[in-house]
Each structure stands twice: as structure tokens, then as C-alpha cells.
């Protein structure tokens, strides 16, 4: 059998940490890189960088949703340890009927990352095996020559540093220990590792962009310039330099093909594929607390003047005070009815009042009976089967009732020869001589519906 676990909890620390975890992180760059030149390979590289950046931003949004779920779980964990102090005060100010709202900012648990896909690969394509020297130089010298690539790289490098500064929110708790704290810290650690990985991928995007800018610079330095080619074409028209110009043009063409071939190969960038964010730990909100007033409801009388007792419930019975110890446990209804029957068999001169025999208790006093009781009208009811348990038992019960009531009348043996031969069916046909219907006997016979006075 597992032993109870002692935990340390600082609820406010958990709530503050939830706010930290949910706080927005740095915004990733949104600029789209431009091709550094007019070469096909350069355009493909720029498109690949844009596609990779779009997918990284999409994954970062999914990670933000997981952090929100993690924050929700932290708030639910804090709520499970009890209400916040000021919210509890609000509940008391509302006469005990205030409620502490459970945090529920969306479903916590498994993240909805099914729609995330790998970054597609842009079709690798470059210049044809043979490209006219002048055309190649014209394309190579067009474009911004890598300026937007450098800006793109700077943006993602800065974002990388920002992400690394944001992981402080995933530190361990100082004043929360226990299994729940360990599980939440493990989930936060997963989020931290994922953020660090996304920071590395951000640096990878920046590295690819910087590489393209450097590749463009290298190609410009190694490829014959458009101005040199134009000058060579002019010299080729001069008979004195024609042969030398044709030979130099062939060398330029060979150099151009080598530069373009290497450019096409190196500009074939790999897509940046981020991993899916880890699913945040799922902690369901605690069940809503039942509103409880400062005074228990069963002690508060309803406003309509009724007794406030639920259907089927009876008030607590007052225990008998005059019965002798060791008296058999006789049903109260049987005891009371038997006493009434015994009273009916007594002579008028004895002065015994039915009230003194009610339930074997220590007598309820000589309160005057109401008109309805004396008239024997609606207050008289047919006797139940359990009300008349036989003359012998009735006599004995009545004797105990009067003895308990202080009457002291000897009733022993009254059951012999006094109605003991009556059949059970005949007893059931009889009617009770008297049924008490006053507030003074409620504690003995229970609450009954008040009858209209006639």
C-alpha cells in the first residue's frame, strides 16, 4: 500500500509561471528573401528559403498553442490545491455562495499537430549545360547581389538569440514539489529543448541565406564580367586582335561553365524541417466545488414558512424520558395505539388522559384537547394493522406507558381475559379512539399536514 506523499506547494508561483509560459515569445521574421541574381539556381534557392521559413513559422505557431495548453494545465494544477486567497474572500463576501472559476483556456493535452508537414523540396534546376557567355554574365550581374539574403540572415540570427533568451520561463519550480510538479517540469523541459532546436533551425536559415550571398559574391569574382565580354567582342572585330580575342573568348566560356556548374550545385539548398512541438502535459480542471453557504442549508428555514424537510424525511424523534431501563424495543406506533386502547377500557372516574399514555414517554402534560379531537370528526382515522397488537400486548404496553408517565396504575395481568379472544380481523375493523393533531406531540408522532379549521 502506497504511503501518503508530502508535497510542497506555492500556488501563486504556479500561477505566475503559467503566465510566463503563455507569454508571447519573439516574433519570427516575415521578410521574403530575393534571389541574388537572375540565375535559375539563385531563384530556386530564394524560393527554398522562403518555403522553409514559412514552415518554421507554422511550427512555431503550433508550439505557441502547446505552451498555452501547458499554461492551462499549470493553472488547473494550481486550482486543484485550492482557491486563490482573494477569490476565496470573494466567495465569502457573497454569503458563501461565490464560486472560484476553473481555468479552461482550451483543451489541454495532445496537441493538434496532425496538419504539420515536412518542408517541401523545391525542384533543383540550374542553367543548361551550355549557356551563352554574355547571357550568363547578364543574369549573374542582375538582382540585388545578395543584399536581401544578408538582411534575411540577420533577421533569423536575431530571432535565434531571442529564442535562447526566452527559455528562462521553463526553469524548475522553487516551491513546488511532488509528482505533479515533476511531471510539469518534465513537460516544460521538453518545450525548452524544442525551443532550443527551433533556435538552431533559425540559425540554419540564416546560415543558408548568408551562404547564398557569399556564393553570389564568389560567382561574380570568378565569372567574366559583362564589360569584359563586351570589350572582347569589340576586339574580335579588329583584324589585329581577332585571333587573340577568339582564343580569349573560349577561355571565358570555359570559366563561365565551371562557375555556373558549381553555382548550380551549391545553390541547391536543403529544406529546413522542424520537428513537431511536444504535446504539453494534460491536467484536467478540478471538478467545480458545490456552493456552500455560511449556514448549512438544513438549518435554514425556507422562506415560504414550510418545515423545509425533504420529501420522505422525518424530524429526529425525541427519545423517551420516563421509560424504565430494559424496556423491550417496541415500535412507537404500536406502543402508542396500545396505550390508547387501554385508556378506552378504563373507567371514566380514573381521570386518565390519553395524553399521558402517548408513546410511553414521561407524559406530555394536561393540555386541553382541541374541538376536532373531541368531536371525533376528521381527526379520527382507521387503525392500522400495527396499531392493535392484541389485548394482552396492548394492556402490557399501556401499563408501561402509564408507569413511565408517573401514573403508577397497576396494569399487570390486564391482558388476561380482557379482549384477548378478539380475532385479528375484528381488531383491524376497529377505529382509533383518538388521534392527536396538535403541535405539542409533533416530537412524538412526527409532522403531519395541518388540517383546515372547520
UniProtKB/Swiss-Prot annotation:
Q: In what ranges is there compositional bias, type Gly residues?
A: 391-422
Keyword line: Secreted
Q: Where would you find this protein in the cell?
A: Secreted
Query: Chief location of this protein?
Result: secreted
Establish whether keyword Oxidoreductase is in the entry: no
Here the disulfide bonds are: none
Phenotypic consequence of gene deletion: Mutant is extremely defective in intracellular growth.
**PTM per Swiss-Prot/TrEMBL:** Cleaved at close to the C-terminus during secretion.
Chain segments carrying region Disordered: 17-40, 82-128, 391-454
Q: Which InterPro entries match?
A: EspB_PE, EspB_PPE, PPE_sf
Superkingdom of this protein's organism? Bacteria
Work out whether the entry's keyword set contains Zinc-finger. no
Q: Name one GO cellular component term.
A: extracellular region
Family that this chain belongs to: Belongs to the EspB family.
- Any additional notes? Secretion of EspB, EsxA and EsxB is mutually dependent.
Domain notes per entry:
The C-terminus is necessary for the co-dependent secretion, for maintaining the EsxA (ESAT-6) cellular levels, and for interacting with EsxA.
Q: Please identify the protein, giving its name as recorded.
A: ESX-1 secretion-associated protein EspB
Give the organism, scientific name. Mycobacterium marinum (strain ATCC BAA-535 / M)
The encoding gene is: espB
Amino acid at each position: 500500500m502506497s504511503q501518503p506523499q508530502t508535497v510542497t506547494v506555492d500556488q501563486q508561483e504556479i500561477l505566475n509561471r503559467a503566465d510566463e509560459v503563455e507569454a508571447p515569445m519573439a516574433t519570427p521574421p516575415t521578410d521574403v528573401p530575393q534571389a541574388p541574381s537572375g540565375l535559375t539556381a539563385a531563384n530556386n534557392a530564394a524560393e527554398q528559403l522562403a518555403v522553409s521559413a514559412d514552415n518554421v513559422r507554422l511550427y512555431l505557431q503550433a508550439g505557441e498553442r502547446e505552451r498555452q495548453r501547458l499554461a492551462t494545465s499549470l493553472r488547473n494544477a494550481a486550482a486543484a490545491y485550492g482557491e486563490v486567497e482573494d477569490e476565496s474572500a470573494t466567495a465569502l463576501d457573497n454569503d458563501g455562495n461565490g464560486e472560484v472559476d476553473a481555468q479552461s483556456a482550451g483543451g489541454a493535452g495532445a496537441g493538434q499537430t496532425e496538419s504539420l508537414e515536412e518542408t517541401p523540396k523545391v525542384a533543383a534546376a540550374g542553367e543548361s549545360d551550355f549557356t551563352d557567355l554574355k547571357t550568363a554574365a547578364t543574369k549573374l550581374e542582375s538582382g540585388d547581389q545578395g543584399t536581401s539574403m544578408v538582411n534575411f540572415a540577420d533577421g533569423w540570427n536575431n530571432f535565434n538569440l531571442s529564442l535562447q533568451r526566452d527559455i528562462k520561463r521553463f526553469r524548475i519550480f522553487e516551491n513546488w514539489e511532488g509528482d505533479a510538479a515533476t511531471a510539469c517540469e518534465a513537460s516544460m523541459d521538453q518545450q525548452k529543448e524544442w525551443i532550443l532546436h527551433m533556435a538552431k533551425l533559425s540559425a540554419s536559415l540564416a546560415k543558408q541565406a548568408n551562404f547564398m550571398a557569399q556564393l553570389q559574391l564568389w560567382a561574380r569574382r570568378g565569372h567574366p564580367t559583362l564589360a569584359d565580354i563586351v570589350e572582347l567582342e569589340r576586339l574580335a572585330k579588329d583584324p589585329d586582335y581577332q585571333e587573340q580575342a577568339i582564343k580569349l573568348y573560349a577561355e571565358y566560356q570555359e570559366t563561365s561553365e565551371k562557375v555556373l556548374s558549381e553555382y548550380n550545385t551549391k545553390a541547391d539548398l536543403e529544406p529546413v524541417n522542424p520537428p513537431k512541438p511536444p504535446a504539453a502535459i494534460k491536467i484536467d480542471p478540478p471538478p467545480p466545488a458545490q456552493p456552500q453557504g455560511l449556514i448549512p442549508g438544513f438549518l435554514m428555514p425556507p422562506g415560504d414558512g414550510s418545515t423545509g424537510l425533504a420529501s420522505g424525511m422525518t424530524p429526529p424523534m425525541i427519545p423517551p424520558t420516563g421509560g424504565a431501563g430494559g424496556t423491550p424495543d417496541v415500535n412507537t406506533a404500536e406502543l402508542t395505539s396500545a396505550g390508547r386502547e387501554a385508556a378506552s377500557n378504563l373507567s371514566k372516574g380514573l381521570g386518565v388522559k390519553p395524553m399521558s399514555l402517548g408513546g410511553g414517554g414521561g407524559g406530555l402534560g394536561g393540555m386541553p384537547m382541541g374541538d376536532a379531537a373531541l368531536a371525533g370528526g376528521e381527526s379520527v382515522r382507521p387503525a392500522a394493522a400495527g396499531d392493535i397488537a392484541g389485548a394482552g400486548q396492548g394492556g402490557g404496553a399501556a401499563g408501561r406507558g402509564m408507569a413511565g408517565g408517573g401514573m403508577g396504575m397497576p396494569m399487570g395481568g390486564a391482558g388476561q381475559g380482557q379482549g384477548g379472544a378478539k380475532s385479528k380481523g375484528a381488531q383491524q375493523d376497529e377505529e382509533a379512539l383518538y388521534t392527536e393533531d396538535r403541535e405539542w406531540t409533533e416530537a412524538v408522532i412526527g409532522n403531519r399536514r395541518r388540517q383546515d379549521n372547520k
